[in-house]
């Protein structure tokens, strides 16, 4: 018979972040998006403290099988990437030791549901603390001049080159906000893009000052399951999103860019972090009712 951790009904949910098992403190997007704003604004959630009693646990990209086996309260694995496609571990086995799995995109949810059909699997989008966002762009005027991309540099290497012909054709100034400067010898580097090291506040401010946010996709399977958080950030800041070269061509027109402002109200309603906290509460309640 396995040992079990004794659970007290504290009403408190501990969130175990990805960084719990890492020995460096570099910013991690999943923690910034899916842990920090929830524990900041919702006192029934907190970052996991070893030895503290919790009513329920959320493993945010933290694949801690031993704890999942021992802890007897409601348990959720929260996923923002299909890491088992890249790394060697048995995700299905781990999934059998929790009650529910939450995913940052609908595509990832559908994939996980096929792997583990007998568990609660829910889509919990990346959401935000909008009080931290700067003033949005406002109305767009004239032809677009500034395009911006942000994220991890290796993803820029993977996705940005497909947009290089249109960036060059329209003479757009390209700003890359990332962990490291763009270094791949290709058409993007030939455009001599500006570089700013990623920080939350400066990144969002710079996006709000741009005309177009670039968010190209990759054909690789891993990218298929990415969330739409970059687009949501841009829409909240009043900046339109170009996924393809044709989008860039269309968004050179200020009227086309201003049509994107209509998405602002939708983002305000659907992507506030309070909605994620409530989704987790509802899932925990469903688990307790099983």
Describe the predicted segments one by one.
Residues 29, 131, 254-290:
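A charged, aromatic-enriched C-terminal amphipathic alpha-helix characteristic of glycosyltransferases
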Residues 1-71:
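N-terminal pre-catalytic "stem/leader" segment of glycosyltransferase-like enzymes
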